[in-house]
Amino acid sequence: MAKIKKRGVSGNAKNFITRTQAVKKLQVSLSDFRRLCIFKGIYPREPRNKKKANKGSTAPVTFYYAKDIQYLSHEPVLAKFREHKTFAKKLQRALGRGEVSDAQKLEANRPKYTLEHIIKERYPTFLDALRDIDDPLNMLFLFANMPATDKVSHRVTKEAEKLTNQWLAYVAKERLIKKVFVSIKGVYYQANVKGQEIRWLVPFKFPTNIPTDVDFRIMLTFLEFYSTLLHFVLYRLYNDSNLIYPPTIDIEKLKGIGGLSSYVLQSKDQGVSALLPQDKKIVEDDVSVQGKELSTANISKALEADNEGEEHEEVEQETVENVELDKFEASATKTAVDSLVQPSKYASPTSTLFSKFIFYVGREVPLDILELCILSCGGSVVSEVALDDLKTNSPDAYKKLDLSNITHQIIDRPKILQKVAGRTYIQPQWIFDCINKSELLPVNKYAPGETLPPHLSPWGDAGSYNPEAEKVDQSENAEEEEEDEVDEDDEDADEDEEDEEEEDEEEDEDLKAQKELELEAAGVKFSEIAEKEKKAAKKASKKRPAEEDEEKELKKIMMTNKQRKLYKKMQYGIDKKETRTQELAKKKRKIEKTKAQLDKLSKK
């Protein structure tokens, strides 16, 4: 006879462990346990049968996989947490006794930990890290725009700002921006980095009220991990592009305008140098202040981590060299038509969209958003703030500027008091819509004071309201009308075929008349049969939706209670979306009608 299994030694009871048991097993505090789980990417699990997993108890408990906790017990960072606990006790004891020198020695030998090995464990290849870089960027941009408080130190916000600016500098230098959307929450950007679509959100730089119900300890733990990850990613990206990491910083620009212009050294200088006369350009010393230099120990660690990460790559990537593309010249005998198309570094049309333009950005326009977009599309930027700064600090250089080279001026004001000849005046939305469409749009709709077209999300939901759908329908109708005209022209050429069709129709009519005569001979009227057929068709058309509703109800009966609730929620969302779409379409028709009436009145 087989032995009876003991209760709680197999199945859910063995596979899962409660959080209290996990903390007790690892011998750490709850806060350290949370930090460790965030670093290692371990999260709570939901067992199928909570009662069995909790050995008969029905109390609300958080569960983890027992294997995950066993995996955590071998983590080197766990040992550092224990060392820190011991260090804190010794430091507290020394301060309590008034032993300041001993406390200083202890502080100098404070135990420190690194997350490099965890990054390599969680992201074996570089592409894995790039695929998961969206959340780190969102978190870092959030903290970069936050003010320093008692919970978030000034050092944390400065570090986040430095990392985000380094990321934006790389994106602008390599011209990687593909989509932009300005929303209520902030500005959404999408870039194509090494073939991976990366999307992140940059909040607006408005005064923010820090909520009191947010646990910043958890967020700062995530920020610590994400900062380390972004350091790794930036180091690899800069090296692949043959750029120095960390990038150089211009202290004067950092003190003045700051932001992206101090990291991308060509951002403002490109625009200003383009305004100078060709024979009298200002020659500046190629001396700039280096940013925070990494220590030799940190550089060696990063190099070792990068080399070890490359060993785990599935596909070997060729070394990127900074070599100019070859220029192919056609032979002298060939004509201009036979000229060879030269290879371009930037394959995407968005990368060279504004390459022939110089934009003058007014002080009322957010420079950080437009600067990134314009530089990523190959354009040059001259800001009104930068020119004012140049006028104050270097009046001689300011006098040599040739402002006639500016092609576009971006303003966000309803009226312009004085216009400069040769400039195209536009509103900022023109930049975003051009990037999203990957083409230069007409500027007449974006002139100052004009009602702008709707700024739609480039990643919009297919089932949501699309104001441009009616325009597409109208264009399709126009195409159909053109096709009808073409068909009418073809009809004249196909008269013979039509004659044959008419003969066939006459034969059908003869058969129909013969059938009527047969029915009359049988004593049945043909009109009565036609009426019966019409009634049957009406009944069938009425019956069809009723049958569909009945079928839906039968399907609902077969659903479980959970599925039925989910179905109701789905239907509620669909109905709400349809109602909203109808309201917006009605609103649009009303606006267009009012606009048409105003146009008629203005013409009179």
UniProtKB/Swiss-Prot annotation:
Annotated Gene Ontology cellular components are: nucleoplasm; PeBoW complex; preribosome, large subunit precursor
Q: Spell out the CDD domains in the cross-references.
A: BRCT_pescadillo_like (cd17709)
Family to which this protein belongs: Belongs to the pescadillo family.
- A GO MF term: large ribosomal subunit rRNA binding
**The protein's assembly and partners:** Component of the NOP7 complex, composed of ERB1, NOP7 and YTM1. The complex is held together by ERB1, which interacts with NOP7 via its N-terminal domain and with YTM1 via a high-affinity interaction between the seven-bladed beta-propeller domains of the 2 proteins. The NOP7 complex associates with the 66S pre-ribosome.
Residue stretches of biased makeup (Basic and acidic residues): 593-604
Q: Which one GO biological process term can you cite for this protein? A: maturation of SSU-rRNA from tricistronic rRNA transcript (SSU-rRNA, 5.8S rRNA, LSU-rRNA)
According to its UniProt entry, what is the function of this protein? Answer: Component of the NOP7 complex, which is required for maturation of the 25S and 5.8S ribosomal RNAs and formation of the 60S ribosome.
* Domain (BRCT) ranges: 349-448
Q: What protein name is recorded for this chain? A: Pescadillo homolog
Q: Give the residue ranges for region: Disordered.
A: 452-562, 579-604
Q: List the disulfide bonds.
A: none
Keywords, ordered alphabetically: Coiled coil, Nucleus, Ribosome biogenesis, rRNA processing
Where found, per UniProt? Nucleus, Nucleolus; Nucleus, Nucleoplasm
Bias regions of kind Acidic residues — which residues?
476-510
Q: Which HAMAP family match?
A: Pescadillo (MF_03028)
